Amino acid sequence: MTKGIITSESPEIHWKHLNVCGGRVLDLGCAFWTEAERQEANGTTKYFLSQKPEFYMGVDINQGDITTLSQQYPQGKFLCEKADSAFQMDTWITENSITHIKCDIEGDETQLLQIGNVHNLKEIAIELHYSDTWLKEFMAWFDSIGFECYRHDSVSFCSEISVIYGRLKC
């Protein structure tokens, strides 16, 4: 497993190791992080759509950002919902034949641990909050769903956060 350091919230730095080209993407936590990102329309939606996925679905609780993103990126599907239910996440994954997930949902990422069948999923990137507490559980979950953790990045500006990347074992 490769280890690295994330130095920015900018999507092209923060999520650069998740390649979604040709995939079916579920972006959990797709709203803008800063007002500057919002003004520049430079969030994860723009970043992932620039990679030319077959399908893109963004979910976030910020209705204003969901409205803006829906207008800016009509090729995407956007939902204003709180991603805090394993059942709901599993439904989105199944109904949309999701192959790639980016997850940054401020602690609710732990709901993923309850999903046992990831269907068509090939790759996932998860921002862990309180990463020391949850890292071992996510590594075990990866193993249980047939994934390997290929990268673990610490975040230089917040020691309680890290990003793990997993993919289907060959």
Residue ranges of model-derived segments:
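SAM cofactor-binding core of SAM-dependent methyltransferases
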Residues: T2-A86
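Conserved acidic-Pro-Pro-aromatic motif
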Residues: F48, F55-M57, G76, W92-C170
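A short acidic-Thr-Gly-centered motif at the start of a beta-strand
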Residues: K16-N19, T91-E95
